[in-house]
Amino acid sequence: MGCATSAEDKAAAERSKAIDRNLRIDGEKAAREVKLLLLGAGESGKSTIVKQMKIIHEEGYSEEDCKQYKPVVYSNTIQSMIAIIRAMGSLKVDFGDGDRTDDARQLFALAGQAEEGELSPELAAVMKRLWADGGVQGCFSRSREYQLNDSASYYLNALDRLAAPGYIPTQQDVLRTRVKTTGIVETHFTFKDLHFKMFDVGGQRSERKKWIHCFEGVTAIIFCVALSAYDLVLAEDEEMNRMHESMKLFDSICNNKWFTETSIILFLNKKDLFEEKITKSPLTICFPEYTGSNTYEEAAAYIQMQFEDLNKRKDQKEIYTHFTCATDTNNIQFVFDAVTDVIIKNNLKDCGLF
């Protein structure tokens, strides 16, 4: 009888040890799993960050992948030109050269007939002539007064290359493409022995109700803000300033009960566009109380302060802020390295090892 009991005890002890071992392995695995939520208003650069993760931490975009983006590059380019020409009508801007009126008609006719993924030599030539026109350039410089893709000038300045026979989009062309994110896009990659799951959530207002179930167990939130949106209004609401909308959203995320334990990383993005714009368009458009100079350093620091001041739990919660240019791979690589170090440090703290 005694032998049977001790054999059972031994088996139970082995089972208990195995359970403990599995729990420890699961615990270590969980500690190495990082869930990142990418949040921010529409067109703040979230999807570009995801593309950069594919370039930096995965195999990047193969030639075949890049070819798939050709229709998007062409569509973005054509739609940008159409948006500028339409705005000339509403803003009452005349062409520098009267002959361009005929080109504008041609643009609409040819764009309507264009095959997806094609840019005919005729359409490219029409767009090139229009883009070189003084009136079109004047209207482009007023793009804050209407909705225009950030990449408009990047693509329109490259029309010869885009229209060349055998054109294949470059990684930079791919990074610059704009497609509205609907739903949730999930990306997985490994970096510094951590397994990342990154969730990109549609930023437009209509998408926000889909976020909530992603919130639980999130390690960190990367909140993207388009610095250059300080003088723009929303695509969904012509009355609402984009920067104010971003601040409202950041306030609701930063002080949300779901995120008491979550690291919040703030990406003040599109710093390159902001640096270009701030000398021509004063920050007082967005912040009438601002009395500083319209230099990049001072204006950017003021915006950073506006966001960080929204944090109601400064004593317990730190906001980790970075100035970023999502289309610059080196910049994002450097910043993401720093972000990962913060995540590792906070993970160690949670385990009582720091």
UniProtKB/Swiss-Prot annotation:
Record lipid sites (N-myristoyl glycine): G2
SUPFAM superfamilies given in the database record: P-loop containing nucleoside triphosphate hydrolases, Transducin (alpha subunit), insertion domain
Stretches for region G1 motif: 35-48
Region (G5 motif): 324-329
Keyword Repeat in record: no
Annotated signal peptide: none
Gene Ontology terms for molecular function: G protein-coupled receptor binding; G-protein beta/gamma-subunit complex binding; GTP binding; GTPase activity; metal ion binding
Keywords of the record: GTP-binding, Lipoprotein, Magnesium, Metal-binding, Myristate, Nucleotide-binding, Palmitate, Transducer
Residues binding Mg(2+): S47, T181
Gene Ontology cellular-component annotations: cytoplasm; heterotrimeric G-protein complex
Pfam families listed in its UniProt record: G-alpha
G-alpha domain span: 32-354
Lipidation (S-palmitoyl cysteine): C3
Record region (G2 motif): 173-181
Positions contributing to GTP binding: 40-47, 175-181, 200-204, 269-272, 326
GO biological process terms held by the UniProt record: adenylate cyclase-modulating G protein-coupled receptor signaling pathway
Keyword Nucleotide-binding found: yes
Gene3D superfamilies, sorted: GI Alpha 1, domain 2-like, P-loop containing nucleotide triphosphate hydrolases
Region G3 motif: start-end pairs: 196-205
Region (G4 motif): 265-272
Family: Belongs to the G-alpha family. G(i/o/t/z) subfamily.
Self-association state and partner proteins as the record states: G proteins are composed of 3 units; alpha, beta and gamma. The alpha chain contains the guanine nucleotide binding site.
Summary of the function given for this chain in its UniProt record: Guanine nucleotide-binding proteins (G proteins) are involved as modulators or transducers in various transmembrane signaling systems. This G protein is involved in 1-methyladenine-induced oocyte maturation.
Name this protein carries in UniProt: Guanine nucleotide-binding protein G(i) subunit alpha
Annotated source species: Patiria pectinifera (Starfish)
